[in-house]
Structure formats: structure tokens, C-alpha cells
């Protein structure tokens, strides 16, 4: 195994964890603009709390190598839902960011599983 793979995997995972932790904060203490977006997409007023909890869980799971694949998988599911929501509502300007984070989550998932396999 490439010796830099665990370093790359960990670094990317921690950056992704930071994204999800900041996202959780932003969804827990939602701005008026984001609340309006959730309403326009048809979600109930409390749904941003569900998003915040899921993003918090993904962020925390990404920190430790043992739980990293679960965090990356959960993050990928959350971002797939966000991408699908924006695309189905033709809100294309908001579709790019969750799509990129979905891709990064899948890369972290693949890298973390490769590192885990190589360690065993």
C-alpha cells in the first residue's frame, strides 16, 4: 500500500468532518434564507433539525478511523438527498455544492475502506 494513502485519507476525512460539523451548526441555527429554501422545497419547518443531527453524526463519525466509513457513508446519503432535492426543484444554483460534497464523501469512503483492508 502507498504510505501516503492513510495520510491523504485522514486529511480529506477531517476536512469533510469540518464541513459537516459547520453544516450541522448552520442547520441547527438556520438563517432566514435557508429556512425559506427548505420551505420552498416542501420540507416542514422542523426538518432542518433532522439535517443538523445527521450532519453532526456524519462529522463526528468521520473523525475516528474506526468509524470513518460510516461517517462517509452517512454523509454521502445526506448529500445525495440534498442534491436530489435541489435538482428535483430545479434549484440548480444550489445543486453544485452538495454534489461536490457527495463526490468527496464517496472518495473518503473508498479511501477509508482501502486503508482498513490494507491494515488487516
Question: What kind of region is each of these model predictions?
Answer:
Residues 5-9, 29-32, 54-57:
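Short hydrophobic/aromatic-rich motifs at helix boundaries and adjacent loops
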Residues 18, 22-47:
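Solvent-exposed, well-ordered loop and adjacent helix/strand elements within mature globular domains
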Residues 54-60, 78-83:
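Hydrophobic, membrane-inserted alpha-helices
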Residues 30, 62, 66:
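Active-site-proximal flexible loops/turns
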Residues 45-53, 57:
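Interfacial helix-start motif at the membrane-water boundary
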Residues 1-25, 49, 65-120:
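Extended, low-polarity transmembrane helix blocks
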Amino acid at each position: 500500500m502507498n504510505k501516503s494513502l492513510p495520510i491523504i485519507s485522514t486529511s480529506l476525512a477531517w476536512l469533510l468532518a469540518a464541513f459537516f460539523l459547520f453544516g450541522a451548526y448552520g442547520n441547527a441555527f438556520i438563517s432566514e434564507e435557508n429556512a425559506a429554501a427548505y420551505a420552498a422545497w416542501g420540507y416542514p419547518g422542523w426538518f432542518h433539525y433532522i439535517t443538523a443531527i445527521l450532519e453532526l453524526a456524519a462529522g463526528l463519525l468521520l473523525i475516528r478511523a474506526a468509524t470513518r466509513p460510516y461517517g462517509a457513508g452517512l454523509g454521502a446519503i445526506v448529500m445525495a438527498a440534498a442534491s436530489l432535492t435541489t435538482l428535483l426543484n430545479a434549484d440548480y444554483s444550489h445543486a453544485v455544492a452538495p454534489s461536490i460534497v457527495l463526490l468527496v464523501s464517496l472518495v473518503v469512503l473508498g479511501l477509508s475502506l482501502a486503508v482498513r483492508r490494507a491494515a488487516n
